[in-house]
Amino acid sequence: VPPGTGWPHDLATPATRVAHGPAEVRDLAASAPTLAELTARQSVCRACPRLVSWREEVAAVRRRSFQAERYWGRPIPGWGAQAPRVLIVGLAPAAHGGNRTGRIFTGDRSGDFLFASLYRCGLADSPVSVTVGDGQRLRNARMVAAVRCAPPANKPTTDERDTCAPWLVAEVAQVAPSVRAIVCLGGFAWQALWPVLRAAGFVLPSRRPPFGHGAETEVRPRDPDAPPVLLLGCYHPSQQNTFTGRVTPDMLDAVFTRARGFSGAGEDSGGSGGRPPGQHGLRRGVHTGQRTGPPAL
């Protein structure tokens, strides 16, 4: 989709500056004056040739079941609240999900599983996320990807992750004043986030806990008077994980209820939108497949 051609919520225009390599990504991310301009610049990035080729090939050929649809076929910027309490970090858009719809975790089964949980936990207006412009709204939450473009086989390279990182650094820095909890969906996002947090000005713990479902630690903003931010690990809601039972609805709900409660995201969200908060609980540590703590009553 060319920028400025009427796609819902597309903030880019034909005049939006385009990054064609890592140095330009760093420059354009760091110099974006507002979150809106950062979003626009992310959405037209062409810094990684392999990812550009793949996302555009998928958008041109299209899956048979989506032949009649127009694909977004561009990088997927972050979306959600402008001043979120909860930041949700995923891996990358799906080729026929976000790359088609223009919004991460939208239009695929992983998104169906994720948004059902976000709705139950009061962090989304609807239990489904179909396409941009469907009325879905995140409540006191924002969603981003460690890599903004759909990668072949859902596996971005280390160089692609590192090239994309300045976009995430800039976005984290812009929303940092309001964020109180960060949920990492999967080990890739967990590992990618540590250098991003440091670059965005956070003080990290001396020992990084290993990734696991329910793993948690606190990071601190550079301002000593600012409250800590809770970092939570969560198994990715991929079909492989959800179909095999490695991650269940209760497991996802436990993580998001913990994030919502710690961050205070439910205090002014306009209602819970589903299951009341406090119905699931996590203790500090790594999830082994069973809930590690009793329900918080």
PLM region descriptions:
Residues 279-280, 287-290:
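Low-complexity, intrinsically disordered or signal/transmembrane-proximal segments
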Residues 1-215, 221, 225-264:
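A polyanion-binding, active-site-adjacent surface
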Residues 292-294:
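Short, intrinsically disordered C-terminal tails of secreted or membrane-associated proteins
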Residues 270:
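Short polybasic linear motifs
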